[in-house]
Amino acid sequence: MDLFFDHLERWIPNLRRYARALTRDREQADDLVQDCLERALSRRHLWNEDGNTRAWLFTIMHNIHANDTRRNSSRPATVPIEDDAGHHARPPSQTHRVAGLEAAAALQELPDEQRQVILLVALEGMSYGEVAETLGIAQGTVMSRLSRGRERLRRLMEDGAPGLRIVK
């Protein structure tokens, strides 16, 4: 098989996970991944075998998502997150499930800029440099957005994310 396709295939699960976090909707995420892969295929001539394929694909996805968001700015800004609990080998305990839902709700309260950086660093395991390359921003900006996002997330978790306060 072609090395280019091997590289694409390797990153599809990561692209899907990030797309689900960005769009908060399974169907929109699948569409975003498909658009990203189509764009990568159409720009195959720009791919560098020795370059960072992951950053290249995530940059494509980020740009498509940003363009779609601008184009659809009249739509509501938030959509409920679907529960992914069915994909775990063992279902989480009720306490862990509630904590996970609270964290997901708090994450959705963050500004997009902070949420994207946190997702790329924490969920995708990207380095600050890779995130900077993916989002087209300076590494220092990544660090400040990450710091502010983590602090805001911590405050939201301490205060209880809207709609998910535990009743005793």
Task: Locate the predicted segments by residue.
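C-terminal edge and immediately downstream basic/flexible tail or linker adjoining helix-turn-helix-like DNA-binding
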Residues: 2-6, 133-134, 151-168
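A short pre-motif secondary-structure segment
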Residues: 117-121
